[in-house]
């Protein structure tokens, strides 16, 4: 591919994550976007679990049973000349590490907010990661077909709680049962909620912001209120600033209802106007890898086992950072220095997949993995070694001892635990004294998902003995004396063989540090 052709292909890519608090409607809006992309004929309804009509992005059995997302899904489609890569992330806080890693693989984020609840805790946490990365954030105020908070309050909350300017691209004309439409000053039109037909979906506005043709809506107090609010904001509110959007200092705000498929298309088309093309990536030494660099490079941000339970496969998800991927190409794995051929590569629609012949910077590809990859691995071509910034890893707070219920099924137990731990959702530790397996997680739901998947995907029932909260601290192996371990600080090693103590509490940690003042303890963050 020539330099010019590569630049043109990269320019068409738009890669974003959808972030929200659980139940704000993140998966539903994903479904509607796929509908516009022609990928699905009808959007699944997350609520309708009994019907078997599950969300396309919630492909794992436990997600379909619970109606929640616990994994990051990758979906790709073309729309209006752009190749769109959507990463639908878990909203549940117990799976925030998976979400944080996903946010390292995108160029922008869509923040979905329940208009009845406003900004919720998980939304705030995920926003801070996006802010830290300086990526553009686009906001969709969802569930307008239900009664919610005042739009002015929601806009003000963005600035008060998140510290980001909000610029409303449209304004609701009523809400809940009284929802009439959206006053869309940006596109100079009113979008009607449930019009007679598609031909009468929009009413044009004139230069003064009034309806261009006579309509009974003009006499409606809700319309007049929306019009007045929008014009007031134009005079006294934040001014639209594309540069601030690009730097993540201003967020365009769209109102709508994902469930009613109202306002979503307008959002998508406007998003494509302002969303950035693939960005450059930094290396630990401060160098920049540009997306149009001719040499291929990328990094593994996620590993997922058993996307196809019949084949017990593993997929390593790679964000391409530069150049072009071609099927059958040889790459170097930075961590090991090994050369490997990328022959079996796929692209995704949640659990369905297609073989991919070529892909460019900004795309997400899946490599069939036999155990060669770890999260954070870089792969590249060319003579210059490429390494990317380290992906975030959380220090677990909850721990359980885990063992196979049936000692005759040790083989499937070990295979399952190794594969699921490599996904990064739980951490594995081994007791120095007994050899017991110990799992660490950020939240209880991770253990429940682990137990469910071990039984359903590996036919291995497990016994889990809660150990409660612990404080994990790593120790330099050169300073380690196994006699330092006691009933209050269990000595274990992590999956890489590094020693650490699991302290009962902070008091036990302080007692240890008083007893061994020269020993350095560290928390992996």
UniProtKB/Swiss-Prot annotation:
InterPro entries tied to this protein: EF-G-like_DII, EFG_III/V, G_TR_CS, P-loop_NTPase, PrfC, RF3_C, RF3_dom_3_sf, RF3_GTP-bd
Domain tr-type G intervals: 11-279
CDD domains in alphabetical order: RF3, RF3_II, RF3_III
Chief location bin: cytoplasm
Subcellular location: Cytoplasm
One GO biological process term: regulation of translational termination
Recorded GO MF terms: GTP binding; GTPase activity; translation release factor activity, codon nonspecific; translation release factor activity, codon specific
Keyword Protein biosynthesis: yes
Any one Gene Ontology cellular component term annotated for this protein: cytosol
Keywords: Cytoplasm, GTP-binding, Nucleotide-binding, Protein biosynthesis
Highest taxon, organism lineage: Bacteria
Transcription found in the keyword field: no
Amino-acid positions noted as binding GTP in the UniProt annotation, renumbered to this chain: 20-27, 88-92, 142-145
Record's function text: Increases the formation of ribosomal termination complexes and stimulates activities of RF-1 and RF-2. It binds guanine nucleotides and has strong preference for UGA stop codons. It may interact directly with the ribosome. The stimulation of RF-1 and RF-2 is significantly reduced by GTP and GDP, but not by GMP.
Entry similarity comment: Belongs to the TRAFAC class translation factor GTPase superfamily. Classic translation factor GTPase family. PrfC subfamily.
This protein's name: Peptide chain release factor 3
Native organism taxonomy: Bacteria, Bacillati, Bacillota, Bacilli, Lactobacillales
